[in-house]
């Protein structure tokens, strides 16, 4: 850790903030009433009777290490076709039938809101202010290299080319969370992908679609994977 502190000022978790680590490989659900009692945000359009339990143990541990050692973090990632459990896209979180778009819209809102709120509340607990540790979020990862080998976002929203509604919605939700905590001027939202230098125009088309008709630029950067 001393080497990291001497040579670097931020780190990115490889797997600990990916959806399958927070949601779990198998569903653990609770009733909406139980979730509200625990402080979970439930969207107005959420019509299901249960929600997934979210596990932040490893995320909290990383935030604590960062705060203790004066390091920043890049949060990776909220929406990805890979390393998101298939059950998250299933009807009632429990079978092999796909859920529908309206239900998935509400689940996306539930997940992004609760993950970002938890991180920023933890930052406030550790340092006194939100946005003090996580300076960037990879909101959507590798949409342009999406694969359909398992149940995922494209099962629900189909192939939308350069105009995927759930990708734009993810950035709208994430930016809304930054504004709710008044950190939109110090935390940046990224679209993250690899081989971006091979498909520059396609990447720009996607980012322009995300920002189109928005009052503010909700996607402010492109992450170029260099590992």
Describe each model-derived feature in a short phrase.
Residues 215-216, 227:
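Short helix-capping and hinge/turn segments at secondary-structure transitions, especially at repeat
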Residues 189-207, 221-226:
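Beta-propeller domains
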Residues 3-5:
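Glycan-processing catalytic domains of CAZymes
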Residues 175, 219-222:
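Solvent-exposed, well-ordered amphipathic alpha-helical segments
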Residues 10-190, 194-196:
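Substrate-binding cleft and catalytic face of glycoside hydrolase catalytic domains
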Residues 1, 149-150, 198-215:
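Distinct, well-ordered alpha-helical segments
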Residues 1, 162, 222-223:
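Intrinsic structural disorder
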Residues 7-11, 216-219:
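Glycine-enriched alpha-helix->loop->beta-strand junction motifs that scaffold or abut catalytic
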